[in-house]
């Protein structure tokens, strides 16, 4: 139960709740029952996000007819059909549609507590953080084989960002991810709460990982998935414009770590107070001030926003740096994603000539320098510096 809507109202009852459930997360999967005629040899349920039933998840319902489905995206339309095999003949039902309720996407991962998708939270401009990109959780050291299969399969985790110190990590996992040897393991110890805002213990290094599209999907965690993990989530959510009230609710969703129980009454309060004191009129502006303070560039911040909030173009990793002109020109390697074209490029507010070919954008800057902006056909933008 999440009830902390301001700094004077936090969910102190979660300690009793956690004790009551026996230190384990509770998940409510979607349950679908299939009523079959006769006695089919095999019953399968197919579930897809696509109306044409492409790329479905397939569940075996033989003998019981009931399927519990974990890890569905929230606020999302799904399509399903049943497939039967009887007397060697395969038949299938018509396609049905159902929609999941809106809200946080909490996922049951074997051996891992407090696992949830950071997507689905509403943000400024009527947008939402995209699901399936960033996950937060507690320690992954004890992940089960089933948990690994979910993380590498359906969720497709590419990067494991560990926010703990070396002493907190099981020795066998100090250089590789418990998920898989194929997952990029990055350990960046960070400070929780207010210290994070001033660059303590790797704040900038942790945030920079989210600027590279090749790192996604990313899972980040500390020990309990609360204090350090909650601080990093707070910054990312503030940056993309999630309402402060929803950020507080997300922080309180960790069932065994209410603010008052872990760091006293002032840890989270100091984070919020320090954040509010940053320069800027909006949460996004304040987050930009802090992210610049800890070493992020405008190009990196542009990428983070476009990755999390749009399907628009982003800079490729090799172009995420200050550009030095050669013969009066600078070039950027772009992943265009769903953007189709560039409509304008400006430098210090003035339009400049450009050319786009095979994802390489060449901009004529002459002897000029400063802040530039690339605008795409879908009205998205990227910021660069010369």
Spell out what each predicted region is.
Residues 350-369, 373-379:
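Long, low-complexity serine/threonine/glycine- and acidic-rich segments characteristic of extracellular
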Residues 78, 317-343:
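Solvent-exposed, low-complexity, repeat-rich "mucin-like" stalks and linkers
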Residues 224, 228-229:
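Ser/Thr-glycine-rich phosphate-binding loops at phosphate-binding pockets of nucleotides
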Residues 74-75, 326, 368:
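Surface-exposed loops/turns
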Residues 65-71, 333, 360-366:
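Exposed aromatic-hydrophobic patches
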Residues 1-218, 231-322:
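Cys-dependent protein tyrosine phosphatase-like superfamily
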């Amino acid at each position: 139960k999440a009830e902390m809507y301001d700094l004077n109202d936090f969910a102190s009852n979660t300690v009793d709740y956690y004790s009551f459930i026996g230190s384990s997360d509770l998940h409510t999967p979607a349950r679908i029952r299939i009523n079959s005629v006769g006695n089919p040899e095999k019953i399968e349920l197919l579930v897809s996000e696509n109306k044409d039933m492409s790329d479905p998840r397939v569940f075996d319902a033989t003998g019981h007819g009931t399927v519990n489905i974990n890890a569905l995206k929230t606020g999302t339309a799904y399509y399903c059909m049943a497939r039967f095999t009887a007397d060697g003949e395969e038949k299938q039902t018509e396609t049905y549609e159902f929609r999941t309720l809106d809200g946080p996407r909490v996922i049951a991962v074997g051996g891992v507590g407090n696992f949830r998708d950071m997507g689905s939270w509403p943000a400024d401009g009527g947008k939402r953080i995209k699901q399936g990109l960033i996950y937060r959780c507690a320690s992954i050291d004890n992940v089960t084989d089933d948990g690994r299969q979910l993380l590498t399969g359906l969720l497709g985790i590419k990067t494991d960002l560990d926010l703990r110190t070396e002493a907190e990590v099981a020795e066998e996992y100090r250089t590789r991810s418990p998920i898989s040897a194929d997952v990029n393991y990055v350990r960046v110890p960070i400070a929780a709460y207010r210290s994070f805002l001033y660059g303590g213990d790797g704040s900038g290094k942790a945030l920079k990982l989210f600027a590279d599209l090749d790192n996604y999907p990313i899972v980040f965690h500390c020990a309990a998935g609360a204090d350090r993990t909650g601080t990093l989530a707070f910054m990312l959510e503030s940056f993309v414009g999630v309402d402060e009230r929803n950020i507080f609710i997300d922080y309180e969703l960790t069932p065994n770590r209410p603010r008052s129980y872990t760091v006293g009454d002032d840890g989270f309060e100091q984070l919020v107070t320090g954040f509010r004191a940053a320069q800027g009129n909006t949460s996004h502006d304040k987050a930009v001030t802090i992210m610049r303070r800890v070493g992020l560039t405008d190009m990196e911040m542009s990428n983070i926003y476009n990755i999390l909030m749009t399907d628009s173009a982003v800079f490729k990793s090799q172009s995420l740096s200050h550009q030095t002109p050669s013969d009066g020109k600078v070039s950027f390697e772009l992943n265009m994603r769903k953007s189709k074209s560039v409509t304008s490029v400006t430098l210090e507010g003035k339009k400049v000539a450009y050319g786009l070919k095979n994802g390489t954008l060449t901009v004529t800057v002459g002897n000029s320098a400063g802040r530039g902006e690339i605008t795409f056909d879908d009205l998205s933008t990227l910021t660069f510096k010369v």
